Amino acid sequence: MNLHEYQAKQLFEHYGLPVKNGAVCQSVEDVDLVLAQLSGDKWAAKCQVHAGGRGKAGGVKLVQDVEEARAFAEKWLGQRLVTFQTDKLGQPVNQIYFEETCDIDKEFYLSAVVDRASQKVMFIASPAGGMNIEEVAQNSLHLLHKVEIDPLFGGLPYQGRELAFKLGLSGTQNKQFTDIFMGLSRLFLEKDLSLVEVNPLVLTKQGYLVCLDAKISVDDNALFRHKDLLALQDLTQNDAREAEAEKFQLNYVALEGDIGCMVNGAGLAMGTMDIVKLYGGKPANFLDVGGGATKERVAEAFKIILTDPSVKVILVNIFGGIVRCDLIAEGVIAAVNEVGVRVPVVVRLEGTNAEMGRQILAQSDVNILTAQSLQQAAELAVNAAKGEH
């Protein structure tokens, strides 16, 4: 689950991390009231969406007066911001965050992620922060400095000092950076985060370090013990189909192809998408119905897939381990009849009662293409998407 910048900065402040004063508005009429809470005569105006690349897309602007702030809010509130991290539709802008400015001397980058290879938390720092950090990550790896922290012990001061030295910080600035490092480490571990990013972390001309931007992602699997964070969830930022899938415990991710995929198991789902690509097709989605797939969940999965107008064929790939393939076959037939599927459906069943499941499909009056192997299923689906079935 992602948080907005203003929400992340509230957490930063709670953990003693240095941020500038800011306030959120949700309507143009609120702009004057919001700016009255802030000092200075110019402010940073930032569209609040769950995506990076806002600055390059025009979603961040330094406004010089109240009139310019109103104009920015009027331009963006209720609109959709498209960045290199969103799809072509972008994400809705429902809030503008206004923040006091500072005199920037230098920009750094600092983040923490879960490193699954080492089973630790990886802190990454760079002296080249700002809007072009993606290019730095691709072309200037020597500018990325890393340190691993053990989740049992958390970050240690010497690790913060080590990163600070590599960034060229010394004296009081080294201590400031170490304090920020320790605060982020506590925040990351105590709130079960999967990502925290400060870009840029700036050094002001007055010699202070400030977290000028903040990005936080929370581990969805830990939300049951963080009701305070769950309350911050903004469902308007989610794909509508993904939000609907969550209600039925379906794992759905929208993609940009035309072959709808319904699979049980995340690994099998990824393998299915790979083989569809191998045969020249493009998956329209990732959809994992889970190990305990039922008729009802299969029907809901069909409904969600078919809300995508790009879908030309649905590929159902089920391995019967926990579930029985004959029950899945009955569920597919019932779902096709209930939902009124108008596109070709390719079904591949393997595992428990697979042969029985294939017989049920063959004896039904529903137009379903049955595959004997995953390769055949992919080939049938790709051909059907091309209109060759």
Curated annotation (Swiss-Prot):
Binding site for Mg(2+): N199, D213
EC number, as in UniProt: 6.2.1.5
Subunit structure: Heterotetramer of two alpha and two beta subunits.
Cofactor(s) the protein needs: Mg(2+)
Keyword annotations: ATP-binding, Ligase, Magnesium, Metal-binding, Nucleotide-binding, Tricarboxylic acid cycle
Annotated SUPFAM superfamilies: Glutathione synthetase ATP-binding domain-like, Succinyl-CoA synthetase domains
GO biological process: succinyl-CoA metabolic process; tricarboxylic acid cycle
Physiological role: Succinyl-CoA synthetase functions in the citric acid cycle (TCA), coupling the hydrolysis of succinyl-CoA to the synthesis of either ATP or GTP and thus represents the only step of substrate-level phosphorylation in the TCA. The beta subunit provides nucleotide specificity of the enzyme and binds the substrate succinate, while the binding sites for coenzyme A and phosphate are found in the alpha subunit.
Pathway connected to this protein: Carbohydrate metabolism; tricarboxylic acid cycle; succinate from succinyl-CoA (ligase route): step 1/1
Enzyme class: ligase
Pfam assignment, any one: Ligase_CoA
Catalytic activity: succinate + ATP + CoA = succinyl-CoA + ADP + phosphate; GTP + succinate + CoA = succinyl-CoA + GDP + phosphate
Free-text comment on the cofactor: Binds 1 Mg(2+) ion per subunit.
Originating species: Haemophilus influenzae (strain 86-028NP)
UniProt similarity note: Belongs to the succinate/malate CoA ligase beta subunit family.
Annotated binding of substrate, by residue: N264, G321, I322, V323
A GO cellular component annotation in the UniProt record: cytosol
Entry's Gene Ontology molecular function annotations: ATP binding; magnesium ion binding; succinate-CoA ligase (ADP-forming) activity; succinate-CoA ligase (GDP-forming) activity
Taxonomic lineage: Bacteria, Pseudomonadati, Pseudomonadota, Gammaproteobacteria, Pasteurellales
Designated name of the protein: Succinate--CoA ligase [ADP-forming] subunit beta
Residues where ATP binds: K46, G53, R54, G55, E99, C102, E107
Keyword Amino-acid biosynthesis in annotation: no
Keyword match Chaperone: no
